[in-house]
Regions:
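Helix-loop-strand module that forms the ligand-binding subsite of alpha/beta enzymes
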Residues: 65-149
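N-terminal beta1-alpha1-beta2 submodule of the flavodoxin-like/Rossmannoid cofactor-binding fold
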Residues: 20-96, 103-105, 203-208, 214-221, ...
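A short hydrophobic beta-strand element
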Residues: 226-234
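N-terminal trafficking/processing presequences and adjacent post-cleavage segments
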Residues: 174-210
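C-terminal helix of von Willebrand factor
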Residues: 157-180
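Compact beta-sheet-dominated globular domain cores
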Residues: 148, 192-196, 244-267
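Stable alpha-helical elements in mature extracytoplasmic
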Residues: 30-37, 41, 105-109, 137, ...
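Bacterial Sec-dependent N-terminal signal peptides
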Residues: 1-20
Length: 267
């Protein structure tokens, strides 16, 4: 109990310090999903907010975006963006949002970080994705912005964006960005071989995803007040015949009728 009280006191102290800082939610959204998360962040934080816009807007069509993105990546010509109205120098903390494209932040964000000075700023990434990309995009930001302080970020699958409000509440409190109390999440249990029941949970959560994720081999679990969470080690074989491993996270709500949900894959 003493440890919990000390942790809560530390979080409260951080949140008090955070309240004295100026915060901007700065984001790019192609089809509105990242915008939904950005506006929820702005609502919970009471921060300023601004959207990054490409001069030549992307169409929102999946295949068209892939084709255009491939051309931009191959040529190294990132898309021109409209000048942002906010002055980055006026802010201490910037929540930087984007969809994941090609395993990292969307190309308009590449232009943004190249053309603006983020030195000395605290950057909190947030992203939306089909399967994952928070970890890889955060590492890319660290390389692109070596003089900024890149913090732990938040990511959510597009298919689960309705869960963002509740998850952001926990994320912001846990990381000291707003006041409040949340019980710490337990650690996942030791990895053990999957059972047929575990495989059924994995299949129910992942079978509708458009790309094969592989075969679950090991699993660690944890119980929270509202969910049973699974951390699967998954093996797959690429087109070159080489085997690779990834971690796939699945959650199952404890309410009646809840279905398993695939939350993220980390490669």
């Amino acid at each position: 109990m003493r440890k919990l009280l000390l942790s809560l006191a530390m979080v409260t102290g951080i949140a008090t310090s955070f309240a004295q800082q100026k915060v901007l939610v700065l984001y790019y959204s192609e089809n509105g999903t990242t915008k939904t998360v950005a506006e929820e962040l702005q609502k919970q934080l009471g921060a300023d907010i601004e959207a990054v816009e490409a001069v030549e807007a992307y169409t929102g069509d999946f295949q068209a975006t892939i084709q255009r993105g491939n051309k931009e990546r191959e040529s190294g010509q990132w898309p021109a963006i409209k000048a942002i109205k906010k002055n980055i120098k006026d802010y201490d903390i910037i929540f930087l949002g984007y969809p994941i494209w090609f395993g990292t932040y969307a190309m308009p964000i590449a232009t943004l970080v190249k053309e603006n000075d983020f030195a000395g700023k605290t950057i909190v990434p947030f992203c939306t994705f089909g399967s994952g990309g928070l970890n890889t995009s955060s590492e890319a930001l660290k390389k692109a912005l070596p003089k900024a302080n890149i913090k732990q970020g938040y990511g959510v699958r597009t298919a689960r964006v309705a869960a963002a409000a509740k998850e952001l509440d926990r994320f912001l409190i846990e990381n000291g960005y707003k006041e409040g109390e949340v019980a710490p999440l337990p650690a996942y249990g030791e990895l053990v071989p999957v059972t047929p029941e575990d495989s059924a949970v994995f299949s129910a959560a992942c079978s509708t995803y458009q790309f094969p994720l592989g075969t679950p081999k090991m699993v660690g679990k944890r119980e929270t007040e509202t969910t049973t969470d699974y951390k699967f080690t998954v093996k797959s074989t690429g087109m070159n015949g080489e085997e690779s491993a990834s971690t796939v996270y699945v959650t199952v709500g404890k309410e009646e009728g809840a279905q398993p949900e695939f939350t993220e894959v980390v490669r």
